[in-house]
């Protein structure tokens, strides 16, 4: 169920829209175009896999979609709002309300427990510690980590840390979740549980997912597979 400050979107409404998205980096005397006038629409409740060779720009794309980097040209709109029109403070608040991130490396805070890491986005949002930790326990249970909530990241296995990172991304009931190899550190059974959780969220809360992966099985599980090649996205046959 969507959080009170997250507007409800019906499945099939456009949740994410990219128009002319371009990212150019300066390398010495040359400009290198990583993304070239890219176009993408993702509907609420849709799960889209992005595949492509290493160095094709997949991580750059995720960073632009999440507002962690600014495009050289073009626009990203999420839940009807343009990221380009937001200052840094407004963008940070928007990310907290609308976007969940799961990276290939978990980026958990080492000095906090799993429970505290998962609750952190809700505390930043202004919820009480009691409210935030109750919701964090709920989502940790959904990823099979209810018994490990008091452990710090250094006391967890790689797969456990990844599950905590996934829980942290989902705890705010985001409109959009951006994932970079989300099941890479998980065994097959746990990965299956995570996929089922994603399926349920997409269907029930109209959360959209964009999943960067090299795993053909994970890609095939999604509603669409898009291939990034030479800065452009095309639907994979």
From Swiss-Prot:
SUPFAM superfamilies the UniProt entry points to: P-loop containing nucleoside triphosphate hydrolases
Topology class, membrane: Peripheral membrane protein
Enzyme Commission no: 7.6.2.-
Source species, domain of life: Bacteria
InterPro entries linked to this entry: AAA+_ATPase, ABC_transporter-like_ATP-bd, ABC_transporter-like_CS, ABC_transpr_LolD-like, MacB-like_ATP-bd, P-loop_NTPase
Keyword Protein biosynthesis: no
Keywords noted in UniProt: ATP-binding, Cell inner membrane, Cell membrane, Membrane, Nucleotide-binding, Translocase, Transport
Record-annotated ABC transporter domain positions: 16-237
Source organism per UniProt: Chromohalobacter salexigens (strain ATCC BAA-138 / DSM 3043 / CIP 106854 / NCIMB 13768 / 1H11)
Localisation: Cell inner membrane
Official protein name in the record: Lipoprotein-releasing system ATP-binding protein LolD
Single GO term (MF): transmembrane transporter activity
Binding residue positions for ATP: 52-59
Its job: Part of the ABC transporter complex LolCDE involved in the translocation of mature outer membrane-directed lipoproteins, from the inner membrane to the periplasmic chaperone, LolA. Responsible for the formation of the LolA-lipoprotein complex in an ATP-dependent manner.
Gene Ontology biological-process annotations: lipoprotein localization to outer membrane; protein localization to outer membrane
Family stated for the protein in its record: Belongs to the ABC transporter superfamily. Lipoprotein translocase (TC 3.A.1.125) family.
Quaternary assembly: The complex is composed of two ATP-binding proteins (LolD) and two transmembrane proteins (LolC and LolE).
GO cellular component terms listed in the entry, alphabetical order: plasma membrane
Signal peptide, first to last residue: none
